[in-house]
Amino acid sequence: MVSSGKKYSRKSGKPSVEDQFTRAYDFETEDKKDLSGSEEDVIEGKTAVIEKRRKKRSSAGVVEDMGGEVQNMLEGVGVDINKALLAKRKRLEMYTKASLKTSNQKIEHVWKTQQDQRQKLNQEYSQQFLTLFQQWDLDMQKAEEQEEKILNMFRQQQKILQQSRIVQSQRLKTIKQLYEQFIKSMEELEKNHDNLLTGAQNEFKKEMAMLQKKIMMETQQQEIASVRKSLQSMLF
């Protein structure tokens, strides 16, 4: 015969008393190592009784009053388990607090050590950086002075180059003018030479013509004289 408690639990959708006990028993089995010896003996004794009664009930059947006894016993076991869990929680809290305290002390010590090391390292490198930056500033000042000197020299050289370009431009202009005058003079000279040559050629031609005429006249006179002489010799 099925008990009314079981019917009610199944209809309501809640876990049965046996399921609750089984879950509690499983949970307690996992945590046995952390409990004291007396608590384990109590739980094991009650668990054995419950298991024995469950076997009797499954083999021969149990009346509905047995369900109430089992329920009461399970409630007692649940109270013991809750006490054990509460004690375990308290011990765990104590261990946790002690561990946290120790960890915090270690962390504070490590943090302080690291902070001191960082501060020492920062001071050391800050001094080195400060020295380097000071040297850098001096080098920059020297570089700026050198740059200013170079710029002044460059300006002077640029001014000299500009003046030199002006002088060269003037000289080139003078050379150009002189060259133009030279070309013009050469052209005039060649023109004069051409005129002189033409005049000389004309004069030479005239002289040659006069000379030729003179030679011809002399030749004629000689021929006439020769003819006269020949005639005279023939006549006389």
From Swiss-Prot:
<protein>
    <recommendedName>
        <fullName>Synaptonemal complex protein 3</fullName>
    </recommendedName>
</protein>
<feature type="region of interest" description="Important for oligomerization and fiber formation">
    <location>
        <begin position="69"/>
        <end position="74"/>
    </location>
</feature>
<dbReference type="GO" id="GO:0000795">
    <property type="term" value="C:synaptonemal complex"/>
</dbReference>
<feature type="region of interest" description="Disordered">
    <location>
        <begin position="1"/>
        <end position="40"/>
    </location>
</feature>
<dbReference type="GO" id="GO:0007286">
    <property type="term" value="P:spermatid development"/>
</dbReference>
<keyword id="KW-0158">Chromosome</keyword>
<comment type="subunit">
    <text>Component of the lateral elements of synaptonemal complexes. Homotetramer; the tetrameric helix bundles assemble end to end into long homopolimeric fibers that exhibit a transversal striation with a periodicity of about 20 nm (in vitro). Interacts with SYCP2. Forms a complex with EWSR1, PRDM9, REC8 and SYCP1; complex formation is dependent of phosphorylated form of REC8 and requires PRDM9 bound to hotspot DNA; EWSR1 joins PRDM9 with the chromosomal axis through REC8.</text>
</comment>
<dbReference type="GO" id="GO:0003677">
    <property type="term" value="F:DNA binding"/>
</dbReference>
<dbReference type="GO" id="GO:0007141">
    <property type="term" value="P:male meiosis I"/>
</dbReference>
<comment type="function">
    <text>Component of the synaptonemal complexes (SCS), formed between homologous chromosomes during meiotic prophase. Required for centromere pairing during meiosis in male germ cells. Required for normal meiosis during spermatogenesis and male fertility. Plays a lesser role in female fertility. Required for efficient phosphorylation of HORMAD1 and HORMAD2.</text>
</comment>
<feature type="region of interest" description="Important for oligomerization and fiber formation">
    <location>
        <begin position="231"/>
        <end position="236"/>
    </location>
</feature>
<keyword id="KW-0175">Coiled coil</keyword>
<feature type="coiled-coil region">
    <location>
        <begin position="66"/>
        <end position="223"/>
    </location>
</feature>
<keyword id="KW-0137">Centromere</keyword>
<feature type="modified residue" description="Phosphoserine">
    <location>
        <position position="36"/>
    </location>
</feature>
<keyword id="KW-0597">Phosphoprotein</keyword>
<dbReference type="GO" id="GO:0000800">
    <property type="term" value="C:lateral element"/>
</dbReference>
<feature type="region of interest" description="Interaction with DNA">
    <location>
        <begin position="52"/>
        <end position="57"/>
    </location>
</feature>
<dbReference type="GO" id="GO:0051321">
    <property type="term" value="P:meiotic cell cycle"/>
</dbReference>
<feature type="modified residue" description="Phosphoserine">
    <location>
        <position position="59"/>
    </location>
</feature>
<keyword id="KW-0238">DNA-binding</keyword>
<keyword id="KW-0132">Cell division</keyword>
<dbReference type="Pfam" id="PF04803">
    <property type="entry name" value="Cor1"/>
</dbReference>
<feature type="short sequence motif" description="Nuclear localization signal">
    <location>
        <begin position="88"/>
        <end position="91"/>
    </location>
</feature>
<keyword id="KW-0131">Cell cycle</keyword>
<keyword id="KW-0539">Nucleus</keyword>
<feature type="modified residue" description="Phosphoserine">
    <location>
        <position position="38"/>
    </location>
</feature>
<dbReference type="GO" id="GO:0051301">
    <property type="term" value="P:cell division"/>
</dbReference>
<dbReference type="GO" id="GO:0005634">
    <property type="term" value="C:nucleus"/>
</dbReference>
<feature type="region of interest" description="Interaction with DNA">
    <location>
        <begin position="88"/>
        <end position="91"/>
    </location>
</feature>
<dbReference type="GO" id="GO:0000775">
    <property type="term" value="C:chromosome, centromeric region"/>
</dbReference>
<dbReference type="InterPro" id="IPR006888">
    <property type="entry name" value="XLR/SYCP3/FAM9_dom"/>
</dbReference>
<dbReference type="GO" id="GO:0035092">
    <property type="term" value="P:sperm DNA condensation"/>
</dbReference>
<dbReference type="InterPro" id="IPR051443">
    <property type="entry name" value="XLR/SYCP3"/>
</dbReference>
<comment type="similarity">
    <text>Belongs to the XLR/SYCP3 family.</text>
</comment>
<keyword id="KW-0469">Meiosis</keyword>
